[in-house]
Design a protein with these regions (language model features):
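N-terminal export/targeting and maturation segments
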Residues: 1-51
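Residues that act as N-cap/strand-start positions at coil-to-secondary-structure junctions
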Residues: 10, 36, 77, 101, ...
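Short beta-strand elements that form the blades of beta-propeller/WD-repeat-like
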Residues: 23-28, 77-84
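Surface-exposed loop/turn elements that mediate protein-protein interactions on large endomembrane-trafficking
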Residues: 44-55, 96-98, 134-136
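Extracellular ectodomain segments of secreted/surface proteins
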Residues: 54-82
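Short, solvent-exposed mixed-charge patches
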Residues: 84-85, 139
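A short, structured loop/turn motif at beta-sheet edges
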Residues: 86-92
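Ser/Thr-rich low-complexity repeats and stalk/linker segments
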Residues: 93-139
């Protein structure tokens, strides 16, 4: 709700996903820029409540799917790469982090949120990504 107030708009929740100690929330504005998608990462504290980690980030749009890397917690090199899928065609992503081996990630049918985790380095990270439909064609 606080984010909606800052955006001067009502927000519509699209997904709330709990994964271990993390909670991810994907949302959009009802009226202003309704085609934008936003994501925020929360972390469970000692009391068992979720606290926001960082601020809401606008996801990068590529056709009918949206992408956003979310960094780790204070010194943690883990990166969570978020894919919000609204495409009926998107089925698979292939990632090559830090010039390492390629990893294939299945994307659930739309609408869906996929979180893929990888390790960055001390000096940051680099990621090549490609997205494919069910016939194996790059999108």
């Amino acid at each position: 709700r606080e984010v909606g107030l800052r955006m001067e708009d009502q927000i519509r929740l699209l997904e709330i996903r709990d994964e271990g100690e993390d909670r991810f929330v994907v949302f959009c504005g009802e009226h202003k820029r309704p085609d934008d998608r936003w994501i925020i990462r929360f972390r469970k504290n000692e009391a068992g409540n979720y606290e926001p980690y960082g601020i809401a980030k606008r996801m990068m749009q590529r056709r009918a799917y949206y992408l956003q890397p979310l960094g780790g917690y204070s010194g943690d090199p883990e990166v969570c790469y978020a894919i919000w899928n609204e495409s009926e065609q998107l089925m698979e992503a292939r990632f090559r982090p830090n010039d390492g081996p390629t990893e294939t990630v299945r994307i659930a049918p739309a609408p869906s949120l996929t979180i893929w985790r990888f390790q960055g380095g001390e000096d940051g990270w680099h990621l090549e990504s490609h997205y494919y439909d069910s016939a194996g064609n790059e999108m």
